[in-house]
Amino acid sequence: MRVLRNFTIFFLFTALSLFRQISASAGDLHPVYVSCVNRCIENKCHGNPSDTSKLPLDLKLFRWDCGSNCGYECEITAENYFAAHNLPSQQYHGKWYFIRVFGIQELFSVFFSMLNFMIHYNGYHIMRRCIPDEHPAKRLCLSWAIVGMNAWVWSSVFHIRDTPITEKLDYFSAGAFVLFGSYCTLILMLRLDQLPGGKLLCWIIGVIFIAAFIAHVSYLSFYSFDYGYNMKANVAVGLVQNILWYYYSWSNRNSGLYWTRWPAYIVTSLMLATSLELFDFSPIANLIDAHALWHLSTVPITHYLYGFVVRKCSYDLTKGTFKIKAYDSSR
């Protein structure tokens, strides 16, 4: 349990450090950047930053306008200034400068987000094929994969083009995935649906989770888009989920089944992957940063997640954990 305590502390430290990084942004406050943007809007946009008439097709396609394009071009100007004066690169509105490719802001983050979508898509079909229809949690597991696919779709969209709308859709979808993952973990690990009155209990917990998500989204949408609150909410829910996964591995440590250790390995790997954000650095070749590498690292982790779910659900049936008709393992 000491290992669990240490990794819990590490997880909290890493997550809170991420919030400090998100909040800090010196580049867009630098006089070189500010004066450049003002001149660009005045001279190129003729005072109308929403104009798109002179932009190439790829920028129009991804909803760039003259003002946002000025911001991008002035990031280049500011970065050249910093390099000429031996100053470190800076972040702009919470992000590093990236080379834009055909209107796409963060090419590798988009690509790695799409890889994550594919691994969830593949996981969906593996579970659909390998989890027996008799398992009462099969639909829940499939829904988990669908929520995951949705989250990575909006992650891809957000990294293609960062706007207030795509940012909210990315954050809200990620929050839904974390919350729904915690709900699924409660059901799968603790088998709440097999308790007396378990179906009602699961329904009540589901309603509470849905109400919490609606309240969370409403607060961020209509009151204040508070990055700190959003981070803390996701950390709290994620921490509960991680503890449950660790508990499952610990409680089955003497089972003799190698795959019961996977939840602990998965959570530990996820925490280590998240630490990439803690050691943030300016993008390599202005294309790949720590955030992109974090997206890449979650691909193999998710693969093992679905592998574990399939094994556990099959084991539940063969060992009679669920009170249903006998499962024919030869199918």
UniProtKB/Swiss-Prot annotation:
It is found in: Endoplasmic reticulum membrane; Vacuole membrane. The keyword Signal applies. Pfam families: Per1. Keywords: Endoplasmic reticulum, GPI-anchor biosynthesis, Membrane, Signal, Transmembrane, Transmembrane helix, Vacuole. Residues 1-24 form the signal peptide. The chain crosses the membrane at residues 101-121, 140-160, 169-189, 200-220, 233-250, 264-284, 290-310. One of its GO terms (molecular function) is hydrolase activity, acting on ester bonds. Residues 122-139, 190-199, 251-263, 311-331 are cytoplasmic. It is a multi-pass membrane protein. Residues 25-100, 161-168, 221-232, 285-289 are lumenal. One of its GO terms (cellular component) is fungal-type vacuole membrane. The keyword Transmembrane applies. Involved in the lipid remodeling steps of GPI-anchor maturation. Lipid remodeling steps consist in the generation of 2 saturated fatty chains at the sn-2 position of GPI-anchors proteins. Required for phospholipase A2 activity that removes an acyl-chain at the sn-2 position of GPI-anchors during the remodeling of GPI. Required for efficient transport of GPI-anchor proteins. Belongs to the PGAP3/PER1 family. This is Protein PER1 homolog. It comes from Schizosaccharomyces pombe (strain 972 / ATCC 24843) (Fission yeast). The lineage of its organism: Eukaryota, Fungi, Dikarya, Ascomycota, Taphrinomycotina.
